[in-house]
Every structure is written in C-alpha cells, then in structure tokens.
Amino acid sequence: MKDDNKILKLIYTFFLGLLLAIFIGIGTNTFYESPTAPTYPIEVKNNNGELTDGQTALQVTYENKMETYNNKTITVYNRNVSIITLSAATILLVLSLLLKKKKIKIITDGVMLGGLFTLIYSLIIGFSAQDNNYSFIAATVGLIVVLYLGYHRFVRQQK
C-alpha cells in the first residue's frame, strides 16, 4: 500500500511539472502572440498558365516578405520567447528552493521539475532563433541555474 502512494506521488510530481511548463508555454503564446506570416497573393494562386508581369511582381514581393519574416521577424520572436521562458524557468527553480524550506516536498519537486521542463523548452526555442551568441548565453545561464539548484537541493542538503 505504501508503494502505491510513492508511485502516485511520483506521477503527481511529474504531472505538476509538466503542467507548469505547459502553462508557461501557453501563457507566453497568449500574451506575446507570434507574428503573422505574409499571405500568398490570391492573384498568383488562381493562375493556370504562365505568370503575367503583374503576377510576377506580386510573387517577388511575397517572396521578399517571406524572407524577411523567416530571417528576421520570427528569429527575433523566438529569441524573445526564449528570454521570457528562461526567466520563468529561473523563477520556478528559485521558488522550488524557497518552498523547500516549507517542507512541502511533493509540491517543491513538481515546481522544480516544471522549472527544468520550462528551461528545456526555452533552450529549444532559443536554438531556433538561429543566433549562436544568444544560444550560448542561454545555455550558459541554464547551466549556472541548474548547477546552483543541484548544489542547494542535493549537496548542501547532505551537510
């Protein structure tokens, strides 16, 4: 019977962490909406034969807008989302250290796991920003936060 309780606590902790990461991801998308991609011109869509000069101009304009969208707009958006979620992950991980003092182990572990899942999400989004400098900084911050958390949660606890 006691083993069933341990399994249930483990599942609850994992589920809480997963829900926190999902909450932060959806919250970020809700309050910081992604940019809208350019729409393909209808005049070019309905063409059955060769493109006219006007349609060619529309096609070139659309391709230029898509290039700007893919190379600049969405890259900046992904970097900003990564910054927001990295901050949220750090807050969750610090909160898990503070909750540890309250002796609420199952909640503390769930919050810590949520922070780690959010950190992973943040790094993945950061990599899609295609900025090596930012990716390196984000990975460094993540590493420092995880090392600090690990020390305070596991090493310092044993002393």
Give each language-model segment a name.
Residues 18, 85, 111-115:
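Hydrophobic alpha-helical transmembrane segments of polytopic
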Residues 92-159:
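Juxtamembrane interface at the cytosolic side of transmembrane helices
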Residues 31-77:
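Low-complexity, proline/glycine-enriched hydrophobic segments characteristic of transmembrane helices
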Residues 75-88:
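N-terminal membrane-entry
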Residues 5-11, 75-78, 101-104, 108:
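Membrane-interface helix-boundary signature
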Residues 2-5, 48-56, 102-105:
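Alpha-helix capping and helix-coil boundary motifs
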Residues 1-35, 143, 150-157:
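Hydrophobic secretory-pathway targeting helix
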